[in-house]
């Protein structure tokens, strides 16, 4: 897992997530090819999702051939260390889709329980608009409404809001949102790893944890299927291509 080459495929999406595994943090990388195949790219064992460790991890993956020739979409939650590492390794202009589920749950966590279900529905309805401008206006209305209700919740919604609308801005939310608006693709992998290792309650060494996690990941990978929206992936490829062309012309 940690040594396999990745230059035998054409890559389009990178998903990143950190999960607690046997009291340690495991940061996992999952790639999606232009034809929709999912593949594990690697993992790193760390105490926290800090920028230095995550950047070194991403560079190592890139050195093994993980390159988005037509551009790359990166999907992650709001972890600042991971976010900063992605910008450092893949550039300031790489499009990042922040997980809408994490954003929604972070916002409602500031609200009284009696209001949380209502606000989950409001946020979900706003994000469901496939048009970027319509979704953005709906979310900005919710920001203004939240300022009257709970300033902390409003600030939480505003933080990184544009990155939760990346698929909308690229014009592919209706076609690809089901697969890439959240980090669910990679979180489901870790959930299955936990199922396979839940009975192991004693770890002699840190290396043993890494080996067990890697073995479980490889077992899970054998059951991978293509992403549901694989037939629409050319739309994302073209959108990323267009974005790169516009940016290169602007820089010329």
Positions of predicted regions on the chain:
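Acidic/histidine-rich catalytic cores and adjacent linkers
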Residues: 125-252
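A detector of single, family-specific signature residues
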Residues: 34, 45-54, 59-65, 90, ...
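A generic short alpha-helical patch detector that favors 3-5-residue windows
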Residues: 21, 46-50, 74, 96-99, ...
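Short helix/loop capping segments that flank catalytic or ligand/cofactor-binding pockets
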Residues: 23-24, 83-84, 109, 165-166, ...
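RNase H-like nuclease fold core
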Residues: 1-76, 80, 84-92, 160, ...
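Conserved beta-strand -> loop -> alpha-helix junction used to position metal-binding or nucleic-acid-contacting
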Residues: 72-80, 85-124
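Short acidic, glycine/Ser/Thr-rich loop/turn "cap" segments at secondary-structure junctions
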Residues: 39-43, 66-70, 104, 120-127, ...
């Amino acid at each position: 897992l940690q040594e396999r080459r990745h230059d035998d495929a054409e890559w389009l999406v990178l998903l990143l997530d950190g999960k607690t595994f046997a009291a340690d943090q495991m940061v996992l990388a999952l790639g999606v090819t232009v034809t929709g195949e999912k593949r594990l790219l690697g993992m790193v064992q760390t105490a926290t999702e800090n920028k230095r460790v995550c950047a070194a991890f991403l560079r190592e993956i890139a050195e093994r051939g993980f390159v988005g020739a037509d551009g790359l979409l990166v999907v992650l939650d709001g972890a600042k260390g991971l976010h900063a590492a992605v910008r450092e390794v893949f550039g300031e202009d790489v499009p990042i889709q922040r997980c809408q589920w994490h954003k929604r749950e972070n916002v409602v966590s500031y609200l009284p329980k009696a209001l949380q279900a209502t606000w989950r529905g409001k946020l979900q309805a706003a994000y469901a608009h496939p048009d970027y401008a319509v979704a953005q206006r709906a979310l900005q209305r919710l920001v203004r409404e939240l300022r009257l209700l709970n300033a902390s919740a409003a600030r939480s919604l505003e933080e990184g809001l544009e990155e939760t609308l990346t698929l909308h801005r690229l014009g592919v939310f209706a076609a690809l949102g089901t697969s890439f608006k959240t980090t669910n693709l990679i979180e489901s992998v870790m959930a299955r790893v936990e199922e396979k290792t839940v009975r192991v309650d004693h770890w002699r060494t840190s290396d043993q944890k890494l080996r067990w996690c890697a073995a479980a990941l490889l077992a899970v990978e054998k059951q991978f299927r293509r992403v549901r929206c694989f037939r629409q992936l050319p739309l994302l490829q073209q959108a990323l291509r267009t974005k790169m062309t516009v940016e290169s012309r602007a820089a010329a």
